[in-house]
Each structure stands twice: as structure tokens, then as C-alpha cells.
Regions:
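PLP-dependent amino-acid enzyme catalytic core
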Residues: 1-101
Length: 101
């Protein structure tokens, strides 16, 4: 990555991008609670909290990125097709997002 590309990335409005992504994901990604893990907390001597993203419709957090990207594409971009290289959670997220679009 060239220095100009790094500077451009640093100047982006990440807060606005996050708000837009959250808007796109409304009604898609499930809200998962943060839950304590007494067993892991006892084992480590520290409070351990878990976010069970395995409860998402695709079984992982990957639905968030895949859905957000596909939802951001124009009709022209969609017409060219969607390709992913994954045999796992990302592929499931892409397939789900493409079907829902």
C-alpha cells in the first residue's frame, strides 16, 4: 500500500461508515447479548464475557461484513455477479446476503 493510500484511508469518516453499515444491517443481523462465562472467568481469574455470534442466522459474525458489502453494491455491480473465495462462514454470509438482496 502506498503512503497516499494510507493517508486517504486515515482521512475517511469511519463513524459515518459505521452508522451506514448499522442502518444496512437493521433487521438482518441478530442482536446477540454479551454474557458472562463463570467457568472461563474462574479458570483465568478474570471476568470473561462472551458474545455468542454463533447464534446469527448463518452461525457466525461473518454475516455482518458480507451483508453490508452486498447491500452497498449498485444494481450495475450486482449484474456483474458476486464471487467469494471461502468454504466456510464468509461463504455462508455472502450466500445469505445475495439471497436476501
Amino acid at each position: 500500500m502506498e503512503q497516499k493510500d494510507v493517508l486517504k484511508a486515515l482521512q475517511r469518516d469511519h463513524a459515518a461508515e459505521l452508522k451506514l453499515a448499522a442502518e444496512r444491517l437493521k433487521g438482518t443481523a441478530r442482536h446477540t447479548e454479551i454474557i458472562p462465562s463463570p467457568v472461563l472467568s474462574e479458570m483465568t481469574g478474570h471476568e470473561i464475557l462472551l458474545k455468542p455470534e454463533n447464534l446469527q442466522v448463518t452461525g457466525s459474525f461473518k454475516i455482518r461484513g458480507a451483508y453490508n458489502k452486498i447491500a452497498s453494491l449498485t444494481e450495475e455491480q450486482i449484474a456483474h455477479g458476486i464471487v467469494t473465495a471461502s468454504a466456510g462462514n464468509h461463504a455462508q454470509g455472502v450466500a445469505y446476503a445475495a439471497r436476501e438482496r
